[in-house]
Design a protein with these regions (language model features):
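Membrane-integral, polyisoprenol-dependent glycosyltransferases
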Residues: 1-189
Length: 189
């Protein structure tokens, strides 16, 4: 073979690299037991619903709100019937953003101004948060068992239990934080 002016000399030619690794990383979308994963999520979510909704509207102290429910339940009721405006003369008490109180107002619109109405939205989001934690843990660990354990741990957590069964704003905040974290985990993949 004759050399041309455009061909590099034999000593400087690049030698193809042969590697046992694939050239493109293989996409890993998590565990392959999808049916078991959704069955686990359904069972854990049903258990969470049982614990969060059982006797949710039972009267406390003659039907009065407990702890800070005495602020948030009336403010949500006011927002419901005053087109989103609180007419609270103690404007110094209106220190929290309205989203949590608007969510409480949804329950009050459905069930009235009572314990079930105050606490319904928090219980729904508390149940959804358990499902989110189970799915997030499963996705991060690639293990259905780890996802189930994470969901069960959140079900048995006392703070999560109380936040989901009362009309306090902490449970709503926790739900949105977990949902945002879940969105980041999905976006990472």
């Amino acid at each position: 073979m004759t050399a041309t002016a455009t061909e590099p000399p034999a000593a400087t030619r690049s030698v193809p690299v042969i590697s046992p690794a694939p050239l493109v990383p293989v996409a890993d979308f998590g565990p392959v037991d999808r049916l078991n994963g959704w069955a686990m999520t359904s069972v854990v979510t049903a258990l969470a619903a049982l614990t969060r909704f059982l006797n949710l509207g039972s009267p406390t102290d003659a039907g009065t709100p407990i702890f800070d429910e005495k602020h948030y339940a009336p403010q949500a009721w006011q927002m419901l019937y005053n087109h989103g405006v609180e007419d609270n003369p103690g404007y110094g008490l209106v220190v929290h953003p309205p989203v949590g109180k608007q969510l409480i107002a949804i329950g009050e619109a459905l069930f009235g101004y009572n314990g079930l109405g105050w606490r319904f939205s928090g219980a729904v989001l508390g149940v959804v948060m358990v499902a989110l934690v189970a799915r997030i843990a499963r996705r991060m660990s690639r293990s259905t068992m780890v996802g189930a354990i994470a969901g069960l741990l959140l079900i048995s957590d006392g703070v999560s239990f109380v936040a989901a069964r009362t009309a306090l704003l902490d449970g709503f905040l926790a739900f949105f934080v977990v949902a945002a974290f879940g969105a980041l985990i999905v976006d990472r993949d």
